[in-house]
């Protein structure tokens, strides 16, 4: 049975019924980067240029300084940027030919934000975690060893019941979930855009997919409660958590997973294409996401299968480090990855991987060999 806290499933801020929905991104047009407001996934409004035109046409409107980067936009969203973006979206809702309106197909789509921190949830979909355990047991049985997964990992032979850890994660006495939340760091330096190539590193063959729903932090968060965590969410995006499943060739640190090697090759963190402000995502804990490889569905799940929900994971992360506007928390991957399979089919040069989160966006990646 998958447990998701029901207390906060309606915590997303309801959008004004009359508001024009929009998404946000960072784009490049002939070498010039700009922040864009995206309408209907097809048109991109240059925020700075549109704001200048709006203030010329409405001399009595408050003057709003355009943000220089997405982290600034996020930090100022509730102050002055959000109201102005809603005005710009409404003013450009109809088809128009203003010079600040671009067809998205004519632009380079960059990662929407440059976060200081990317956190990824591990084994947050129980079916995925169980698949890893079962495949580890099959592999161990075939080799005559003991199964149960890597030391300290899901299904470890010496696994004990999870206990409360004050200051880190405090469990209620009746919480039946077998583990506490689990997060690891991924370097922002390996982030690429939603349409960029994913590079298979030289000598590595076991390259896996993980299509994930990502949370964008909106306010500085440190030691926040689960109840207050929704107030620290700005919106939602996508991370394609590309993973190298090959070992490192030794038994250092007990032979357990090396997250640096597995998760941090160049291009292994595609993010975007957009960030959707939370008021336009009415049910973040009931959102379908799926992955296809060369048109074949490999993953197809829903955020309601998570073991720990968005707000629990944000609160947990804030117990360890200070989160700031624009930081990302990727919420883990559903079942269907190669690490769960007896006969894996790894990604290889020539493949096309597509990661979709409904209502948020789509990533399309050609898999290529390292030059």
Where are these predicted regions, by residue range?
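Bacterial N-terminal signal peptides
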Residues: 1-9
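Boundary at the C-terminal end of the N-terminal hydrophobic targeting segment
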Residues: 11-15
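Active-site microenvironments in enzyme catalytic cores
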Residues: 16-27, 55, 59-297, 368-370
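Charged, cofactor-coupling segments
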Residues: 16-34, 38-53, 266-273, 304, ...
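Short, basic/aromatic beta-hairpin or loop at an interaction surface
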Residues: 188-191, 262, 300-308, 323-334
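Short beta-strand/loop turn elements enriched in aromatics
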Residues: 285-303, 317-325
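A conserved acidic, glycine/proline-rich C-terminal tail/linker
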Residues: 309-347
């Amino acid at each position: 049975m998958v447990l998701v806290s029901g207390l906060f499933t309606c915590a997303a801020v309801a959008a004004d019924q009359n508001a024009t929905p929009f998404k946000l991104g960072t784009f490049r047009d002939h070498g010039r980067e700009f922040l864009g407001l995206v309408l209907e996934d097809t048109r991109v409004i240059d925020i700075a240029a549109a704001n200048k035109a709006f203030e010329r046409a409405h001399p009595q409107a408050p003057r709003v300084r355009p943000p220089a980067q997405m982290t600034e936009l996020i930090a100022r969203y509730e102050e002055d940027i959000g109201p102005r973006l809603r005005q710009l979206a409404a003013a450009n809702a109809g088809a128009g030919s203003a010079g600040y309106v671009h067809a998205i197909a004519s632009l380079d789509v960059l990662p929407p934000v440059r976060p200081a921190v990317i956190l990824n949830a591990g084994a947050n979909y129980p079916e995925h975690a169980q698949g890893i355990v079962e495949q580890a047991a099959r592999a161990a049985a075939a080799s005559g060893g003991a199964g149960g997964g890597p030391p300290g990992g899901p299904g470890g032979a010496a696994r004990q019941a999870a206990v409360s850890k004050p200051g880190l994660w405090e469990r209620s006495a009746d919480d039946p979930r077998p583990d506490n939340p689990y997060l690891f760091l991924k370097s922002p330096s390996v982030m690429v855009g939603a349409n960029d190539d994913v590079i298979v590193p030289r000598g590595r063959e076991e390259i896996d997919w993980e299509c994930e729903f990502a949370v964008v932090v909106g306010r500085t968060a440190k030691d926040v409660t689960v109840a207050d965590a929704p107030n620290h969410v700005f919106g939602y995006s996508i991370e394609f958590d590309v993973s190298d499943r090959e070992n490192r060739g030794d038994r250092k640190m007990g032979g357990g997973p090396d997250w640096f090697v597995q998760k941090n090759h160049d291009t292994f963190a595609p993010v975007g294409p957009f960030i959707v402000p939370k008021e336009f995502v009415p049910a973040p804990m009931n959102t379908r996401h799926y992955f296809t490889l060369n048109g074949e569905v490999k993953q197809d799940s829903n955020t309601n299968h998570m073991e720990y929900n968005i707000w629990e994971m944000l609160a947990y992360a804030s117990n360890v480090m200070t989160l700031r506007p624009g930081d990302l928390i990727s919420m883990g991957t559903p079942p269907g990855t190669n690490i769960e399979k007896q006969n894996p089919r790894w990604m290889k040069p020539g493949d096309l991987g597509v990661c979709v989160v409904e209502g948020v966006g789509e990533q399309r990646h050609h898999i290529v060999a390292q030059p």
